[in-house]
């Protein structure tokens, strides 16, 4: 598929339309300059920002917005590091006051060892945030039942973890992801657990609308090159999904016709 055709393959969340299907984070880089270079190399249009960990408002210290420009990227504030619904809601209200952001990513973690989501707290916080005027993309477990509950509660997007945050273990439960994608009427994005380019490709081949990653790029030996690799991986996976893979067969089938042989 040529570039002109691919450019029309967009996705939409909360009324906002994007061409890039790769979302990148803003943590773990050696500095904001490297972070900005990686975001550019990834071809990203959205960057997710941990409100509690990134300087957005103190001009006396290095600021993310001096390097990753809000007029170039859509900022997606998140609640990384929050373990209660109240903490997450307070964090996102501060983000809205600081930058006017109402499209946000909710994550309410259950413990510090695996950083998997507390789904009861997540669902409760989601309902309160929606009532407060936020458009919420939700980090969640790969449980199709809870994913549907989040969608029915008004989530703008469902973001199941492929594996624990920062683990780099890749997609651990492709079946559950496929079930979530099949039933969803809102975008589904793999969030957390991607380790290398093939993981991103698999996520897109399953039918995900996009992939979010941070550590896989930031902790690579060459983050900028890995960002480029992830960009191509996401495109390849999406193209393969749209093309439709060949069926799997039990037995061989010759690739050349048998008729007309000497």
From Swiss-Prot:
What does the similarity note say?
Belongs to the ThiG family.
- Under Enzyme Commission nomenclature, its number is 2.8.1.10
Q: Which HAMAP family match?
A: ThiG
Broad class of where this protein is predominantly found: cytoplasm
- Keyword tags: Cytoplasm, Schiff base, Thiamine biosynthesis, Transferase
Task: Determine the domain of life of the protein's source.
Answer: Bacteria
Pfam families linked to this entry: ThiG (PF05690)
Functional summary from the UniProt entry? Catalyzes the rearrangement of 1-deoxy-D-xylulose 5-phosphate (DXP) to produce the thiazole phosphate moiety of thiamine. Sulfur is provided by the thiocarboxylate moiety of the carrier protein ThiS. In vitro, sulfur can be provided by H(2)S.
Work out whether the entry's keyword set contains Metal-binding: no
- A biological process from GO: thiamine diphosphate biosynthetic process
InterPro entries in the cross-refs: Aldolase_TIM, Thiazole_synthase_ThiG, ThiG
Report disulfide bridges, numbered on this chain. Answer: none
Organism annotation: Phenylobacterium zucineum (strain HLK1)
- What is the protein named? Thiazole synthase
Summarize the subunit comment.
Answer: Homotetramer. Forms heterodimers with either ThiH or ThiS.
């Amino acid at each position: 598929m040529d570039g002109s055709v691919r450019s029309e393959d967009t996705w939409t969340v909360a009324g906002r339309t994007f061409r890039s299907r790769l979302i990148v984070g803003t943590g773990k880089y050696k500095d904001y300059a490297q972070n900005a270079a990686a975001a550019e190399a990834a071809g990203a249009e959205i960057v997710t920002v941990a409100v509690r960990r990134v300087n957005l408002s103190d001009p006396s210290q290095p600021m993310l917005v001096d390097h990753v420009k809000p007029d170039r990227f859509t900022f997606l504030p998140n609640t990384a590091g929050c373990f209660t619904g109240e903490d997450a809601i307070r964090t996102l209200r501060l983000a809205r006051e600081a930058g006017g952001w109402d499209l946000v990513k909710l994550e309410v973690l259950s413990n510090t060892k695996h950083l998997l989501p507390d789904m009861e707290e997540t669902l409760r916080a989601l309902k309160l945030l929606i009532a407060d005027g936020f458009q919420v993309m939700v980090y969640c477990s790969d449980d199709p039942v809870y994913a549907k509950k989040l969608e029915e509660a008004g989530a703008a997007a469902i973001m199941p973890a492929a594996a624990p945050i920062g683990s780099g273990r890749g997609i651990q439960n492709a079946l559950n992801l496929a079930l979530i994608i099949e039933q969803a009427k809102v975008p589904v994005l793999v969030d957390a657990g991607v380790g290398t380019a093939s993981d991103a490709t698999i996520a897109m081949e399953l039918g995900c609308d996009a992939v979010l990653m941070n550590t896989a790029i930031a902790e690579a030996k060459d983050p900028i090159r890995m960002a480029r690799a992830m960009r191509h991986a996401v495109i390849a996976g999406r193209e393969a999904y749209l093309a439709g893979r060949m069926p799997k067969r039990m037995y061989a089938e010759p690739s050349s016709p048998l008729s007309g042989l000497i």
